[in-house]
Amino acid sequence: MTNPDLENAKYINLATYRKNGDVVKTPVWVAVHNGTGYIFSEPNVGKVKRIRNNPKVQIAECDMRGGLLGEWANGTARLVNDQAEIDAMYPAFNRKYGVIMHITNFLAKLVGRYQRRQIIAVTLD
């Protein structure tokens, strides 16, 4: 199993596990800061609940619809609540996704979702 190129992958497919073991795959943006991949999400969605119950994940490079472009790699996810870590990782998203990230952040702030975001850190095994 090869590790996906998180620095250059526009999207990754994040596979999380339900309590019954079923896999749920979700295409997401990812940015790397200090060797850790970061994802942001709404706080009460399924992937966050599944990570809270089981931090084991798999990731693979994919297109925006989740079509695989690379091989799966095993990893561990954790929910980030440390504000200093959150503040430190956001510039990586801004560099990687540029204007689209700035627009996404502006709209999220406009509707009150920016501060509610749940940040997820993924490290490869």
Regions found by a protein language model. Name each.
Residues M1, V24-T26, N44-G46, F106-A108:
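A generic local structural motif
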Residues A9-P43, Q58-E61, E71-A73:
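Short beta-strand segments
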Residues M1-K10:
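Protein maturation boundaries and topogenic segments
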Residues G46-I119, D125:
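Short, structured beta-strand-loop surface elements
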Residues T16, T123-L124:
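Short, structured patches in soluble enzyme cores that scaffold and shape functional sites
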